[in-house]
């Protein structure tokens, strides 16, 4: 049963990924500029530019170019970077561990802190703590991440000297150095999602705590801790699980800005540099990879959601 469910969800994701690939290609075609001119240089002759256009297949109709690009994509060929002079897939593979490390560390901070704050806020409804959690949630959607990141660098790196202001240390080189290089950007990245998760957890907990079986458990003399942990939280956790996948996607997307500020050599920084340098194959490949990653995360969350709540059925 579970194998059939997984195969079904993966099969449903394939056309979505195909649409993502086609939209990515078409968006790149809408951008101004000629890749052949970028490769040849401003002083190149028209003959040189035309020769490069033919070599890249840019002289072909858009439909033919799309078909060739999808064929190359099927063979895991994302093209070659103009700026880096290396395959796009290699550039992505080299920088992916940084982005994943940043997102996972931020996720590890967000989930326990956000859930605990949401549970306590629901239990202490209308208290000063509850008000503080709601204020933090509002802060998360109001304050730009780059502004808070710059303040954090000034305070914790420049003034106090607790953390490095930029750079990345691979985990295998130094686990402690890896943690020091990521803890500040990961905390800033997590802060905006902690408020959202806390608000979501609080809402689910309040809804569950108003159910009849919670009142029945309390009337039977069940301890308040057991009511919260065993009955209320376990049932509210199903919805929180769904949100966690969305949060992880947001953390990966938010890493674009954070990586720029903290000079982390991840996918976000690669994408920004490629956009500024008009390195279209890298822009195209990175956007496509991130799109596929988001689809894969959603599929995984759907599967976990069904495992956590067997009542869920897909048509």
From Swiss-Prot:
Keywords: Cell inner membrane, Cell membrane, Membrane, Transmembrane, Transmembrane helix, Transport. GO terms for molecular function: dipeptide transmembrane transporter activity. Its main location: membrane. The chain crosses the membrane at residues 13-33, 102-122, 136-156, 178-198, 238-258, 287-307. It is a multi-pass membrane protein. The keyword Transmembrane helix applies. InterPro entries: BPD_transp_1_N, MetI-like, MetI-like_sf. Disulfide bonds: none annotated. It is found in: Cell inner membrane. The keyword Cell membrane applies. Pfam families: BPD_transp_1 (PF00528), BPD_transp_1_N (PF19300). Residues 96-305 form the ABC transmembrane type-1 domain. GO terms for cellular component: plasma membrane. It comes from the Bacteria. The complex is composed of two ATP-binding proteins (BMEII0205 and BMEII0206), two transmembrane proteins (BMEII0207/BMEII0208 and BMEII0209) and a solute-binding protein (BMEII0210). Belongs to the binding-protein-dependent transport system permease family. Probably part of an ABC transporter complex that could be involved in peptide import. Probably responsible for the translocation of the substrate across the membrane. This is Putative peptide transport system permease protein BMEII0209. It comes from Brucella melitensis biotype 1 (strain ATCC 23456 / CCUG 17765 / NCTC 10094 / 16M).
């Amino acid at each position: 049963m579970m194998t059939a469910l997984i195969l079904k969800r993966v099969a449903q994701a394939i056309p979505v990924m195909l649409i993502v690939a086609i939209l990515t290609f078409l968006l790149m075609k809408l951008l101004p500029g000629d890749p052949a001119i970028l490769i040849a240089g401003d002083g190149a002759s028209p003959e040189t530019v035309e020769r490069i256009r033919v070599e890249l297949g840019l002289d072909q109709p858009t439909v033919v170019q799309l078909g060739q690009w999808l064929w190359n994509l099927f063979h895991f060929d994302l093209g070659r970077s103009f700026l880096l002079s290396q395959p796009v897939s290699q550039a992505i593979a080299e920088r992916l561990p940084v982005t994943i490390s940043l997102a996972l560390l931020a996720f590890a901070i967000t989930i326990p802190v956000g859930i605990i704050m949401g549970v306590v806020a629901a239990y202490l409804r209308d208290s000063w703590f509850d008000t503080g959690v709601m204020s933090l949630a509002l802060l998360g959607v109001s304050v730009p991440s780059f502004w808070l990141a710059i303040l954090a660098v000034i305070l914790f790196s420049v003034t106090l000297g607790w953390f490095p202001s930029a750079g990345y240390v691979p985990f295998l080189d130094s686990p402690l150095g890896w943690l020091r290089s990521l803890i500040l950007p990961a905390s800033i990245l997590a802060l905006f999602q902690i408020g959202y998760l806390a608000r979501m957890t609080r809402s689910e907990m309040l809804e569950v705590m108003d159910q009849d079986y919670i009142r029945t458990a309390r009337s039977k003399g069940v301890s308040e801790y057991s009511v919260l942990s065993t009955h209320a939280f376990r049932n509210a956790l199903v919805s929180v699980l769904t949100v966690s996948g969305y949060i992880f996607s947001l953390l990966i997307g938010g890493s674009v800005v954070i990586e720029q500020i903290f000079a982390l050599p991840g996918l976000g920084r690669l994408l920004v540099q490629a956009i500024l340098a008009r390195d279209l194959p890298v822009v195209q490949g990175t956007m496509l990879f991130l799109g596929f990653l988001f689809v894969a995360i959603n599929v995984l969350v759907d599967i976990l959601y069904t495992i956590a709540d067997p009542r869920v059925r897909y048509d």
